[in-house]
Curated annotation (Swiss-Prot):
NAD(+) binds at residues 185-213. The keyword Protein transport does not apply. GO terms for molecular function: oxidoreductase activity, acting on the CH-OH group of donors, NAD or NADP as acceptor. This is Ubiquitin-conjugating enzyme E2 variant 3. In the N-terminal section; belongs to the ubiquitin-conjugating enzyme family. UEV subfamily. Homodimer. It comes from Xenopus tropicalis (Western clawed frog).
Length: 476
């Protein structure tokens, strides 16, 4: 390509050593004229972004008498030439990455030349020459067979998400949103740690609304033993910009009646949700407080949000466990995709067989077992799962699973607490767990179950009536 020093000078306006960088790139252009320069957005591991100079091109080399052109991508940091570039392979869909001494599974390139980088001895031109030498010793890429092509395209998408950075020119950078967890107890900490481990959030915030230290043990511990990208606060203004707000607050007292405890929870929400709605008017609310159906309903009413942006964790954990057991019993992952636990998160929940995960990225249809076999599998699976509780850590993993789908806009199906009026013959304004398609807009659709037995409908309708009866006793 034609080299334009003036264009580069304008693009590198924020670079500390712009003139030195331009002179070095002139030399690179003379030696490797096929490299293309462009300013692209680089996403770091912590979710922060910076506009950096991106170089894409090929490294010519020979291996066993055959000439190869290895596609690479270099990111030139704004402290160049005193800091080495970040280097990645850039394989096409029919290429596989060969992990070796200098290449990791994500295509990141590691060379002694980079480790020993020292200006003015080290240059980008010298780096590419070093790559050619090392690539001749060990080819970094290999040709895929046709049947591996589809898997490789998925790999490339994955690589783009887990490497230090990715050019938006090739693959859209994964969303790494700000996520807030509200609460100060074990449930809040479990959700926070699970979401952090999932890697979905660029920034995590724990907002502890409790007064004093008694109820805020988890928050206090996090202030002592801090975690990267995690902020602990009592200031509601700090949650501004959160894409997801996870509600875990609960108030339990042995001296109160059941309705009294629920009313205490409602009052907690009343003191929290107006501030959430003010600072995060576009966020999604994910409720993990118990009982989740009633607390999700109260959150919906008190927040004033559209019902599609308010959901509860529902039976997502139960459904995941149920499908896992079905897979083991039937020795088939494919056959468990249509198995769901729905309804009320209590002894009244029911197992159903419905449509498979209808997300856009699933191409394999669900295997439909004969009804008698479905019943046998269901009975055996529920027997195995009997007595399996919902401890904080397991609920936290379920919350992280849902959060990942919402933030990444996966269009994946989860059994979550959603407004159920008009489905399964339910006429009440209640939230029950049903298979829903989730994305960045919240609940974007519901999956129609294949079973319409009267017994299932009656169970859901009884749950809806009982829940509404309690809701009518609450002051909202």
């Amino acid at each position: 390509m034609e080299f334009s020093a003036e264009t580069l000078r304008q693009q590198l306006g924020k670079y500390k050593f712009r003139d030195l960088t331009i002179e070095e790139l002139k030399d690179l252009n003379r030696t490797f004229p096929s490299f293309i320069f462009s300013m692209e957005t680089y996403t770091f591991r912590d979710g922060s972004q910076k506009d950096l100079l991106n170089l894409t091109g090929t490294v010519p080399m020979k291996h066993q008498g055959t000439t190869y052109n290895i596609p690479i991508c270099l990111w030139i940091l704004d402290s160049h030439p005193f800091a080495p570039p970040l280097c990645f392979l850039k394989p096409s869909g029919n290429m596989g990455i060969r992990v070796g001494r200098h290449i990791d599974a994500q295509g990141r390139i590691y060379l002694p030349y980079l480790q020993n980088w020292s200006h003015p001895k080290s240059t980008v031109t010298g780096l590419i020459r070093e790559m050619a030498v090392k690539f001749e010793e060990e080819l970094p890429l290999y040709s895929l067979s046709a049947e591996d092509g589809a898997r490789q395209r998925e790999l490339l998408s994955y690589i783009a998400q887990v490497t230090d950075g990715v050019s938006s020119m090739d693959v859209k950078a994964p969303s790494r949103a700000k996520v807030t967890v509200i609460g100060g107890g074990d449930m809040a900490l479990a959700c926070l740690l699970a979401v952090s481990a999932k890697g979905t959030a660029g920034k995590l915030l724990l907002l502890d609304p409790t007064d004093g230290e008694a109820a805020g043990g988890a928050a206090a511990d996090l202030e002592i033993f801090s975690l990267p990208n995690v902020q602990v606060t009592k200031d509601f203004s700090a949650i501004a910009g959160s894409a997801i707000v996870i509600v875990t607050v609960n108030s339990w007292s042995n001296s109160q009646s059941y309705v009294g405890v629920l009313q205490s929870n409602v009052e907690l929400l009343r003191g929290i949700l107006p501030a959430v709605a003010h600072h995060c008017p576009k966020c999604l609310l994910l409720v993990a407080s118990q009982p989740v159906e009633i607390m999700t309903y109260a959150t919906w009413k008190l927040s004033g949000f559209p019902h599609n942006r308010v959901l509860g964790i529902g039976c997502n954990l139960d459904s995941g466990r149920f499908r896992h057991v079905i897979e083991k019993l039937a020795d088939s992952e494919e056959g468990a995709q249509g198995a769901w636990i729905i309804g009320e998160q209590s002894d009244n929940k029911v197992a159903v067989w419905g449509a498979p995960d209808s997300s856009a990225n699933r191409q394999t249809p669900c295997k439909l077992y004969p009804k008698i076999f479905q019943e046998q599998l269901t009975s055996r699976a529920l027997e195995i799962l009997k007595g399996k509780g919902q401890r904080s850590w397991s609920v936290g993993l379920s919350v992280a699973d849902i959060t990942d789908t919402l933030v990444q806009n996966k269009g994946k199906v989860h059994s979550v607490s959603a407004l159920c009026k008009g489905q399964f013959g339910v006429q009440e304004e209640v939230f029950l767990s049903i298979p829903c398609v989730l994305g960045s807009a919240g609940v974007t659709g519901a999956v129609q179950t294949l079973q319409d037995e009267a017994q299932i409908w009656e169970t859901l309708q009884r749950s809806a009536a009982a829940i509404e009866s309690v809701q009518q006793q609450l002051r909202l």
